[in-house]
């Protein structure tokens, strides 16, 4: 298989605290260039350009730039979105507000929920299609034009056209979209069935509303970034990460902007799947601890788990395929505090990039997880990134003592240790959510730890959860950026049938699968991005008649038969619930096809590139320092420079492994080895305590 070595390849990921860049550059020392710069919240494009400059990368000399952005996610969470109007079927304007049976508060007549589109911007027109796609009421075209005029007068920038049962017959929606664009060419227009051709009008409507609300925001951002790159000589197509773990050409990204929500965590899981599988661990739990939060995911047989049900917040379900990631508010910048009851809390509030942890010297005054690691000797105060004004360890310890230690009657060191214990407990809970809660024993997986802070906590987390192996990739602090580099192009398609197998026309299933694949192939070819091949992954959503929950069933290549569908569903249902229900009819609900443009593989060894390798592990030791460990207290601990470790280097804990983008803690009783791809493989003595 060929390797992507022609030219320079750049992956750049924007996180809540840092913007990370990796450039595979054959002309650079070690074949790689790296950068980590503070995220520019006001305009993320500035941070991307700053990262290129910091890495010494000339955009005009780059073969491909792949970008992961939090623009859409942040816009939704902060409600800094475009003013959006809705044109919907008469009688259904309040679907987006009524939702399902859940409510933001358990008691009271009102809650704090505010729909993404306020009621005065939700307008109705006469039209009606039934669930079989039959037209009951013709589309009132004059009503559509009147609604367009009203929304324009109300200051809308974006419009959603969302009609009942449009998944079964798109004719009315398509005609209405034509009318909107003719009457209002400058508006951003979203058709619900184009974003999600699936039943359930509430989820389809909210997903389309999210797309419309962030579409102008993402388009403006990508235009700014593309313009800045062009000024620096970049003439190729910019690729953008999506939440499904694939990439899309920037020119198409804004049309389906909702697909970029949660793309940052997805890129990390994609990199983890790529790297862990190559290291011999196709089953892995991913653990990404950054500056603001921690993201945990599951990889099974080398593939990340994909789901299509994300509730970004109450009343905002997003039903497009996304890498399944569980997020908690525990990152390096998470603030530790004493609550009203006198108890120690850690997160979810974060110091962010500004002012950041106390030790960054940017004016931060609240103790964070990073500050606790510094006080306990796990971080080197002289090698912290992005420090504006140096702050001594004693200064940080004094603040932890005053804010945490004194109220609890603890020393500064004891208080810092307590901060780490609580943070680790929260992270262990997240791991249990993606493993035990879904029928997977974490002891059967490796823990793949990355992010700027992940390797600091990974071995303690593995010990707590009895996970026998920890994989620390070559560049843990920029793994999300590496995910951008290794990700394939991807486009997802869905159609609803919602038909019992006994009544199903299997030829219709085959036809829809072929149409989905053809649409994906055409889109990838239109993107004009070099790929080795195009492949399709098919799956179906099924349930037993009368059930509300749906089970995703993967299909092999080729066209499935009815007996094959029934057998695969029965097997999947047994594996998930250990129940057989032969007396109830199975129902095929949705057909899914993911079409991937497989890009040339990236040689992982290039990511570990270094011209500083020593002959032995001992020669890579650059010093020693006093480090606190659970159960033993302070130990005089060797510090290894990771860039100097030779391939095959093996050593026992306690140890600190320092590198440009992260610090790894190896606990007493654990052992580590560096493999050929630069991964640090840690063996945890399960059942032993330190």
Describe the role of every protein-language-model region.
Residues 89-91, 164-166, 194-195, 243-245, ...:
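Short, ordered loop/turn segments at secondary-structure junctions
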Residues 21, 26-29, 33-40, 85-91, ...:
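Glycine-rich phosphate-binding loop of actin/hexokinase-like ATP-binding domains
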Residues 183-207, 466-482:
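Conserved phosphate-binding/catalytic loops in two-lobed NTP-binding clefts
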Residues 163-172, 242-246, 422-423, 445-460:
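Glycine-rich phosphate-binding loops at beta-strand->alpha-helix junctions
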């Amino acid at each position: 298989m060929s390797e992507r070595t022609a030219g320079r390849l750049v992956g750049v990921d924007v996180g809540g605290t840092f913007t990370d860049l990796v450039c595979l550059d054959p002309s650079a020392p070690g074949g790689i260039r790296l950068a980590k710069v503070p995220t520019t919240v006001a305009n993320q494009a500035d941070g991307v350009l700053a990262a290129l400059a910091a890495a010494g990368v000339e955009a005009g000399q780059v073969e491909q730039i792949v970008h992961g952005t939090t623009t859409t996610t942040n816009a939704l969470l902060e409600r800094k979105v475009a003013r959006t109007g809705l044109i919907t079927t008469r009688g259904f304007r309040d679907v987006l507000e009524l939702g399902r049976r859940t409510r933001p508060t358990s008691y009271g007549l009102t809650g704090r929920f505010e729909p993404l589109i306020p009621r005065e911007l939700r307008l109705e027109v006469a039209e009606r299609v039934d669930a079989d796609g039959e037209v009951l009421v013709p589309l009132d075209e004059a009503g559509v034009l009147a609604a367009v005029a009203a929304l324009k007068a109300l200051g809308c920038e974006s419009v959603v056209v969302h009609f009942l049962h449009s998944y079964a017959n798109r004719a009315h929606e398509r005609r209405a979209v034509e009318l909107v664009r003719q009457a209002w060419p400058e508006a951003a227009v979203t058709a619900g069935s184009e974003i999600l051709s699936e039943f359930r009008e509430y989820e389809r409507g909210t997903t389309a509303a999210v797309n419309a609300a962030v579409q102008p925001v993402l388009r403006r951002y990508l235009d700014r970034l593309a313009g800045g790159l062009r000024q620096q000589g970049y003439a190729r197509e910019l690729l953008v990460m999506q939440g499904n773990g694939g990439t899309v050409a920037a020119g198409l990204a804004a049309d389906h902007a909702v697909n970029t929500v949660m793309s940052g965590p997805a890129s990390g899981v994609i990199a983890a799947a790529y790297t862990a599988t190559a290291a011999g661990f196709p089953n892995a739990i991913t653990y990404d601890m950054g500056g603001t939060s921690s993201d945990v995911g599951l990889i099974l047989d080398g593939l990340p788990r994909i789901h299509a049900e994300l509730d970004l917040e109450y009343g905002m379900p997003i039903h497009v395929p996304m890498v399944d990631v569980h997020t908690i508010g525990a990152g390096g910048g998470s603030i530790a505090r004493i609550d009203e009851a006198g108890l120690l809390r850690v997160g979810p509030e974060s110091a962010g990039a500004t002012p950041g942890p106390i030790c960054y010297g940017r004016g931060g005054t609240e103790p964070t997880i990073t500050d606790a690691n510094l006080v306990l000797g796990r971080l080197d105060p002289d090698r912290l990134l992005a420090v504006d004004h140096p702050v001594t360890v004693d200064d940080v310890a004094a603040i932890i003592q005053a804010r945490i230690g004194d109220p609890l009657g603890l020393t500064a060191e004891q208080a810092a240790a307590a901060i780490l214990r609580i943070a680790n407990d929260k992270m262990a809970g997240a791991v249990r959510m993606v493993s035990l809660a879904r029928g997977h024993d974490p002891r059967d997986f490796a823990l793949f730890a990355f992010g700027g802070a992940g390797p600091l906590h990974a071995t303690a987390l593995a010990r707590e959860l009895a996970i026998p192996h920890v994989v620390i990739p070559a560049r843990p602090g920029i793994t999300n950026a590496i995910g951008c580099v290794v990700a394939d192009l991807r486009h997802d398609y869905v159609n609803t049938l919602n038909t019992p197998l006994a009544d199903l026309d299997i030829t219709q299933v085959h036809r829809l699968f072929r149409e989905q694949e053809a649409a994906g192939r055409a889109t990838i070819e239109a993107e004009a991005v070099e790929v080795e091949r195009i492949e399709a992954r098919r799956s179906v959503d099924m349930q037993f008649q009368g059930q509300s929950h749906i089970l995703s069933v993967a299909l092999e290549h080729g066209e499935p038969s009815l007996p094959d569908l029934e057998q695969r569903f029965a097997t999947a249902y047994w594996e998930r619930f250990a129940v057989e229900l032969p007396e109830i009819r199975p129902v095929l609900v949705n057909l899914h096809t993911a079409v991937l443009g497989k890009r040339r593989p990236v040689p992982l060894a290039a990511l570990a590139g270094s011209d500083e390798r020593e002959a032995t592990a001992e020669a890579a030791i650059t010093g020693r320092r006093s480090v606190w460990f659970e159960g033993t207290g302070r130990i005089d601990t060797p510090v290894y420079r990771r860039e100097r470790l030779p391939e095959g280097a093996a050593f026992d804990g306690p140890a600190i492994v320092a590198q440009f983008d992260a610090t790894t803690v190896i606990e007493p009783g654990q052992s580590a080895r560096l493999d050929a791809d630069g991964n640090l493989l840690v063996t945890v003595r399960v059942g032993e305590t330190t």
